């Protein structure tokens, strides 16, 4: 769980920030590639201004060159997190790419249930790039509903949910969602796993994940581009969906290798449905961009 919250509100009266030049954009494009592995084409120059100009206002910097120089100072390294928050994509949702959750129920969970019963095996899942938490909570609800309380209690199931963006992690930890956001959740699961949020200023439109589901998940902040991950365990199931699409080929291959290395034998890796065409050593491709470790 992130210990520090980041406020994007400018502390001074806003002033006009000059649009980035091509040279300035190239500086940030290289920085974003280095730090996050993201590819930003020249068409994203408008996006740099739209997402980052408030940070320049906050520090009373007028040009993107000024802000780039500011970021290069060792004493300002913490400012990089604000940049990460501004430039990362945070789209998420319950039952996004529903085929994956159908596959969990039909193919993966039955095998896991047998292992948990016969071998007393504990299950560890990872939502890599969890954004606002819907994916991780989705995994937890589906697992709880299929496997039952008895099997997942006492450490039978734990889920790691990670993201580089601290702003969305703060939101995920709260576990609060509007009725519109949870509309894809089947009614039977909505009634079972959501409750009215008592801290939402009597806003009946906000519901919270129940505590029995929340306690299954640990939210952690770290960068998937790090050379090593602060993870000691092996996972039986990893979701890393719609992340690879944004990465340059070299970083994409590195990330895939790390994910495979963190999979337990016979574990499953789930990628985004459009993230096809990757050849993973030691992995068998099943369907819907789902792989199993040999």
For the regions a language model picked out, list residue spans one by one.
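Conserved SAM-binding loop of SAM-dependent methyltransferases across substrates and taxa
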Residues: 132-151
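Conserved class I S-adenosyl-L-methionine
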Residues: 120-133, 137, 158-160
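A structural alpha-helix within SAM-dependent methyltransferase catalytic domains
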Residues: 105, 140-144, 260
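A short glycine-rich, Lys/Arg-flanked "PGG" loop and its adjoining helix->strand segment in the class I
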Residues: 253-265
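Extended basic-aromatic, gly/pro-enriched interface segments that bind polyanionic ligands
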Residues: 128, 152-235, 239, 243-247, ...
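Conserved beta-strand signature within the Rossmann-like core of class I S-adenosyl-L-methionine
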Residues: 266-273
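Conserved AdoMet
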Residues: 2-126, 272
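Class I S-adenosyl-L-methionine
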Residues: 275-294
């Amino acid at each position: 769980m992130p210990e520090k919250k980041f406020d994007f509100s400018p502390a001074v009266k806003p002033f006009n920030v000059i649009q980035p030049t091509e040279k300035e954009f190239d500086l940030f494009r290289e920085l974003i590639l280095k730090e996050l592995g993201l590819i930003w084409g020249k068409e994203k120059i408008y996006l740099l201004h739209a997402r980052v100009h408030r940070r320049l206002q906050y520090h009373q910097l007028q040009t993107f060159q000024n802000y780039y120089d500011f970021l290069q100072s060792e004493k300002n390294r913490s400012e990089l997190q604000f940049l990460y928050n501004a430039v990362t994509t945070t789209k998420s949702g319950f039952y996004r790419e529903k085929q994956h959750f159908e596959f969990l129920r039909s193919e993966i969970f039955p095998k896991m249930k047998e292992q948990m019963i016969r071998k007393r095996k504990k299950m560890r899942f990872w939502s890599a790039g969890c954004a606002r938490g819907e994916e991780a909570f989705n995994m937890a609800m589906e697992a709880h509903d299929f496997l039952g309380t008895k099997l997942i209690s006492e450490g039978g199931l734990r889920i790691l949910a990670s993201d580089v963006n601290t702003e969305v992690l703060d939101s995920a930890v709260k576990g609060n969602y509007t009725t519109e956001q949870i509309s894809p959740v089947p009614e039977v699961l909505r009634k079972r796993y959501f409750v009215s949020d008592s801290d939402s200023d009597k806003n009946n439109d906000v519901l919270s994940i129940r505590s029995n589901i929340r306690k299954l998940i640990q939210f952690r902040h770290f960068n998937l581009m790090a050379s090593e991950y602060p993870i000691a365990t092996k996972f039986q199931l990893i979701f890393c969906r719609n992340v690879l699409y944004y990465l340059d080929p070299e970083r994409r291959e590195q990330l895939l290798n790390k994910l495979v290395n963190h999979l337990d034998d016979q574990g499953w890796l789930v990628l985004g449905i459009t993230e096809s065409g990757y050849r993973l050593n030691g992995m068998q491709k099943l369907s819907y961009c789902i792989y199993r470790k040999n």
